[in-house]
């Protein structure tokens, strides 16, 4: 949607002024080239997707897996999140269709942002990974780029006007995720039909 291509550059301007966003490891994104990929990031704050999208944006729309509750706040926000590339995949009957559509777009060169822990971190501790990352990586056959967001504050939490570092790691081949992902995708299809 055209709205995406207006919002992202404006967000880049506002958030770079307000938060002094720094991107490290951009060369790892360039290794992907025009192929599709999955960016798998930690999740500290509700605003994390914005920082990742503005450091990755090159005129290409990014998809973001988002929890169901975000789409239930009100109809305007639901519409806005969909325009911004959010894909609702949790607890809905359309989950299989949404995943199939996301896989297709990744195969065609699209980028998916996913938070493999499934929720925001508490107290800077890593949480167990959910299966969504493995499912999409296996089905799409695209590389996974690890990403880490750092808020330069004493407690590592997002504060207004703090410095933000978005760090991209070396791409990991999809083959590393394929066995577990295919098993999870099969389970998902069996449960949803």
Model regions: which residues?
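Soluble catalytic domains of membrane acyltransferases
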Residues: 8, 17-188
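Helix-enriched interaction subdomains in cytosolic or periplasmic regions
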Residues: 1-11
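A conserved mid-domain beta-alpha-beta active-site/ligand-binding segment of alpha/beta enzyme cores
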Residues: 193
């Amino acid at each position: 949607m055209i709205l995406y291509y207006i919002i992202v550059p404006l967000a880049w301007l506002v958030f770079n002024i307000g938060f002094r966003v720094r991107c490290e490891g951009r060369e790892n994104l360039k290794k992907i080239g025009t192929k599709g990929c999955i960016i798998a990031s930690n999740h500290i704050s509700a605003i994390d997707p914005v920082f990742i999208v503005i450091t990755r944006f090159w005129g290409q729309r990014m998809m973001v897996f988002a929890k169901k509750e975000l789409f239930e706040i009100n109809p305007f926000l639901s519409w806005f999140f969909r325009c911004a590339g959010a894909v609702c995949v949790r607890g809905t009957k359309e989950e299989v269709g949404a995943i199939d559509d996301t896989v297709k777009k990744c195969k065609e060169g699209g980028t998916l942002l996913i938070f493999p822990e499934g929720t925001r971190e508490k107290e800077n501790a890593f949480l167990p990974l959910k299966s969504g990352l493995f499912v999409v990586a296996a089905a799409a056959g695209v590389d996974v780029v690890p990403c880490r967001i750092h808020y330069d504050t004493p407690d590592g939490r997002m504060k207004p006007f703090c410095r933000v570092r978005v760090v991209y790691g070396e791409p990991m081949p999809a083959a590393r995720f394929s066995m577990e992902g295919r098993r999870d995708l099969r389970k998902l299809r069996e449960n949803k039909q």
